[in-house]
């Protein structure tokens, strides 16, 4: 029998409090805050701008440049959390590694996982070169000329270019001929999270579909770490940004088994406790590793309505050492609600109409500022099958209209 001690949770805002700090307080972080608070955890939310969604529900909020190691160390030392939970990539992960090595704080799932996944180079080299997992052919380059040479030297056309540090499809494009290279290079330089720099160029895989396999490392009843899988999530992207997702996505038994093997290999190497969003390309029974996020995934917002425990509850339970339940409740779908306007303090119309249909729900993220293509909310739906759920979720998101405030 394991000697792992049973978790003991304290009372928020008291000397017994269990304190968790989230680095990143967007819409995903907000749901993690809520899940942790339901378990009696005292939560501190940190983001680079004021009034972020997670700030609005946390016990305390800080505005900090999380890529500044000195500023990040200061807020961690001030709050003295028991656990630090990175919710975005753009963080001074070298500092997290140092703090974890010092025994000053525990990082979920691990500081190494946060460090390796903060850019595409670390995780791709781990997956392809260390673990030997199947991936698209790739090269990392630093100049437009090197990009041309990589394509001519074997990557070929079409190919995909992405900044090594970006999210939500920013800076990502498809290069179909030599005429596209200059524009694609400029777009990648503009889309990187920390400015211009290194990119990955990948050979194009003719896949049938892509999935997110939410993979959870959590303590079992005996205290041992057990890996569990949610049902596969299908999703559709436009310009590299998720616009809808659904669960479960139909797969052959062989493809599902191979997907789980790949997810088990990469998450097992990254280690720790928590949820991982493993992105995979699938063609028939063949599966290729694409990316992994050591945190809840945007396509996983469908689990807010489709699962017994959603991805945020799974992450919260796992990082606290509690058992999890990854079962699907009912086929479901999510559909993004975009801002559509450039304004602060927007208002949402059509919400009653959106929720009039049975088996629907909605999340409005509470972002203080709207942009044309900024995610401001998500429509959710369940139905007897995925196709019905997708159509219903689309009706929910389309019914909501965003307008500038008075």
From Swiss-Prot:
Q: What is this protein called?
A: Formate-dependent phosphoribosylglycinamide formyltransferase
Which NCBIfam families does the record associate with it? PRK09288.1, purT
Using the record's annotation, list all stretches that form the ATP-grasp domain. 125-320
Q: Name one GO cellular component term.
A: cytosol
**Family matches, as SUPFAM superfamilies:** Glutathione synthetase ATP-binding domain-like (SSF56059), PreATP-grasp domain (SSF52440), Rudiment single hybrid motif (SSF51246)
Q: Which UniProt keywords apply?
A: ATP-binding, Ligase, Magnesium, Metal-binding, Nucleotide-binding, Purine biosynthesis
Q: Which family does the record claim for this protein?
A: Belongs to the PurK/PurT family.
Q: Which GO terms describe its molecular function?
A: ATP binding; magnesium ion binding; phosphoribosylglycinamide formyltransferase 2 activity; phosphoribosylglycinamide formyltransferase activity
Please list the reactions this protein catalyses: N(1)-(5-phospho-beta-D-ribosyl)glycinamide + formate + ATP = N(2)-formyl-N(1)-(5-phospho-beta-D-ribosyl)glycinamide + ADP + phosphate + H(+)
The protein's assembly and partners: Homodimer.
Q: What is the lineage of its organism?
A: Bacteria, Pseudomonadati, Pseudomonadota, Betaproteobacteria, Burkholderiales
Q: Organism, per UniProt? A: Bordetella bronchiseptica (strain ATCC BAA-588 / NCTC 13252 / RB50)
GO BP term (any one): 'de novo' IMP biosynthetic process
Q: What does this protein do?
A: Involved in the de novo purine biosynthesis. Catalyzes the transfer of formate to 5-phospho-ribosyl-glycinamide (GAR), producing 5-phospho-ribosyl-N-formylglycinamide (FGAR). Formate is provided by PurU via hydrolysis of 10-formyl-tetrahydrofolate.
Chain positions recorded as ATP binding sites: 120, 162, 167-172, 202-205, 210
Taxonomically, the superkingdom here is Bacteria
Q: Where does Mg(2+) bind?
A: 279, 291
EC nos: 6.3.1.21
Record has Repressor as a keyword: no
Q: Which gene encodes it?
A: purT
Pathway field: Purine metabolism; IMP biosynthesis via de novo pathway; N(2)-formyl-N(1)-(5-phospho-D-ribosyl)glycinamide from N(1)-(5-phospho-D-ribosyl)glycinamide (formate route): step 1/1
Which positions does UniProt annotate for N(1)-(5-phospho-beta-D-ribosyl)glycinamide binding? 27-28, 87, 298, 367, 374-375
